[in-house]
């Protein structure tokens, strides 16, 4: 579950029209949220408050072996933050839970009447206790397509790190330059979205896919340690059910690691994901499986959810990546005129020839819209997550939900191993696998 400040940062990106999914760092977000979700390993309580429309603060305490805590402050000059950020009682569980991502990167950044809202800033500071650790972050939108982020960590033992991110997003391409004082690490990320060519006979449903290719290169100047990887992502919808699905393929040429994932929403309340890893050098492989199940409440649509649905419905088509391939509105279309009987006959023949295809297009479009609306209108109150791996031989469970105005997250991880083999040498005939919990934790959040 997202922390309150992470949730506020997501809403800041939404307010300034910054696309979270159009980034190489988040190209594997769908499978990562289902397979590699974090499991809490301690008790943590977080109390947050939206004191003014532009300031937010959080106080949290957590205990594992010793008592710790922190205080966090955030300020932003972005507009409509008081409407985007909700308290824990009225917030939608989907907004604070990392789940399947519906990839719709922007096609282009077009000037809008609210263009000044893109050039905004966010200031973040965190102080921990009893250890005097400090964290700071600055996000500055330079223009509609460029953003600068600075992150700083300072600890009492003199371990200080400053990291800078320069990002340029045109919708079709995303460039990102990273520099850090930790070993003088330098990196470059790039993501390219392939767009289909618009056609008179093909609409977004025949070209209903998102194909993205990206890569990253890293170099530690102090240690001269290189790193690189490349990933291909393909997103589409089922034409018969409207359910989305995502496939990815990742390759690391330095370590010879190949990874492929497949994630699909089997229904409006369930998602399944699989991942296969293979190493060309060691010939080792691993198969991972994960799923999540959402539970609906008695009230299917709250006013806050209905407001979000209306907001998505009123979004202009020119802000979506594939707006140029969407079917035109029949109310705004201009019918061609036939000046002769031969032309009228030709138009009638074309209408008869393509009537079945046009009906199929409308049916597929309706199926996708109905599936998305069914998810948006649902009032989910809890979600179960489960993942396992054949190599690690573990089982990870996580429950997240809402109760009496609180946001709760509880999880555990079970490992299947023989602890005696780690201490004493035991003959293979006496090996017996044990199933025991490796970690367990509970997190509570409350915000006003």
From Swiss-Prot:
Coiled-coil residues: none
Q: Which domain of life is it from?
A: Eukaryota
**GO biological process annotations for this chain's record?**
establishment of mitochondrion localization; mitochondrial genome maintenance; mitochondrial outer membrane translocase complex assembly; mitochondrion-endoplasmic reticulum membrane tethering; phospholipid transport; protein insertion into mitochondrial outer membrane
Location of this chain's protein in the cell: Mitochondrion outer membrane
Per the record, its GO cellular-component terms are:
ERMES complex; SAM complex
What membrane topology is annotated for this entry?
A: Multi-pass membrane protein
Q: What is its main location?
A: mitochondrion
Q: State the UniProt keywords alphabetically.
A: Membrane, Mitochondrion, Mitochondrion outer membrane, Transmembrane, Transmembrane beta strand
Pfam families in alphabetical order: MDM10
How does the record comment on the protein's domains?
Lacks alpha-helical transmembrane segments, suggesting that it resides in the membrane via beta-sheet conformations similar to those predicted for other outer membrane proteins and porin.
Q: What's its job?
A: Component of the ERMES/MDM complex, which serves as a molecular tether to connect the endoplasmic reticulum and mitochondria. Components of this complex are involved in the control of mitochondrial shape and protein biogenesis and may function in phospholipid exchange. MDM10 is involved in the late assembly steps of the general translocase of the mitochondrial outer membrane (TOM complex). Functions in the TOM40-specific route of the assembly of outer membrane beta-barrel proteins, including the association of TOM40 with the receptor TOM22 and small TOM proteins.
Family membership, please give it: Belongs to the MDM10 family.
The subunit field of the Swiss-Prot or TrEMBL record says: Component of the ER-mitochondria encounter structure (ERMES) or MDM complex, composed of MMM1, MDM10, MDM12 and MDM34. Associates with the mitochondrial outer membrane sorting assembly machinery SAM(core) complex.
Protein name as annotated: Mitochondrial distribution and morphology protein 10
Q: Which organism is it from?
A: Zygosaccharomyces rouxii (strain ATCC 2623 / CBS 732 / NBRC 1130 / NCYC 568 / NRRL Y-229)
Q: What is the lineage of its organism?
A: Eukaryota, Fungi, Dikarya, Ascomycota, Saccharomycotina
């Amino acid at each position: 579950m997202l922390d309150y400040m992470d949730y506020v940062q997501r809403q800041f990106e939404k307010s300034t029209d910054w696309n979270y999914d159009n980034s190489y760092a988040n190209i594997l977000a769908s499978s990562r949220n289902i397979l590699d979700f974090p499991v809490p390993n301690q008790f943590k309580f977080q109390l947050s408050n939206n004191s003014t429309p532009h300031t937010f603060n959080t106080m949290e305490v957590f205990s594992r072996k010793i008592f710790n805590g922190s205080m966090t402050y955030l300020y932003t000059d972005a507009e409509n933050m008081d409407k985007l950020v909700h308290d824990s009682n009225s917030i939608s569980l989907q907004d604070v839970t990392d789940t399947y991502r519906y990839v719709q990167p922007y096609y282009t950044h077009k000037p809008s009447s609210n263009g000044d809202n893109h050039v905004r800033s966010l200031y973040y500071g965190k102080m921990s206790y009893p250890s005097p650790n400090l964290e700071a972050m600055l996000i500055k939108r330079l223009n509609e397509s460029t953003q600068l982020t600075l992150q700083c960590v300072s600890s009492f033992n003199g371990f200080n790190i400053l990291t800078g991110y320069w990002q340029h997003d045109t919708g079709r391409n995303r460039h990102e330059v990273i520099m850090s004082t930790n070993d003088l690490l330098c990196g470059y990320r790039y993501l390219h979205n392939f767009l289909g060519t618009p056609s008179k006979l093909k609409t977004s449903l025949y070209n209903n896919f998102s194909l993205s290719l990206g890569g990253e290169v890293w170099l530690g100047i102090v240690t001269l340690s290189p790193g690189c990887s490349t990933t291909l992502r393909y997103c589409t919808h089922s034409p018969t059910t409207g359910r989305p699905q995502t496939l990815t393929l990742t390759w690391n040429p330095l370590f010879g690691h190949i990874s492929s994932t497949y994630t699909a929403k089997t229904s409006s309340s369930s998602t399944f994901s699989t991942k296969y890893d293979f190493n060309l050098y060691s010939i080792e492989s691993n198969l991972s499986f994960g799923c999540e199940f959402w539970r609906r409440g008695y009230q299917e649509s709250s006013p806050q959810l209905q407001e979000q649905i209306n907001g998505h419905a009123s979004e202009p088509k020119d802000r979506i990546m594939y707006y140029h391939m969407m079917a035109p509105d029949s109310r705004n279309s201009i019918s061609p005129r036939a000046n002769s009987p031969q032309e009228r006959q030709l138009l009638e023949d074309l209408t008869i020839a393509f009537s079945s295809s046009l009906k199929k297009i409308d049916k597929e479009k309706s199926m996708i819209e109905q599936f998305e609306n069914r998810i948006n209108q649902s009032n989910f109150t809890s979600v179960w997550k489960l993942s396992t791996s054949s190599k690690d031989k573990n089982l990870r469970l996580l429950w997240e939900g809402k109760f009496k105005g609180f946001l709760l997250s509880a999880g555990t991880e079970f490992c299947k191993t023989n602890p005696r083999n780690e201490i004493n040498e035991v003959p293979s005939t006496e090996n017996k696998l044990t199933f025991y919990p490796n970690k367990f934790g509970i997190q509570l959040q409350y915000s006003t």
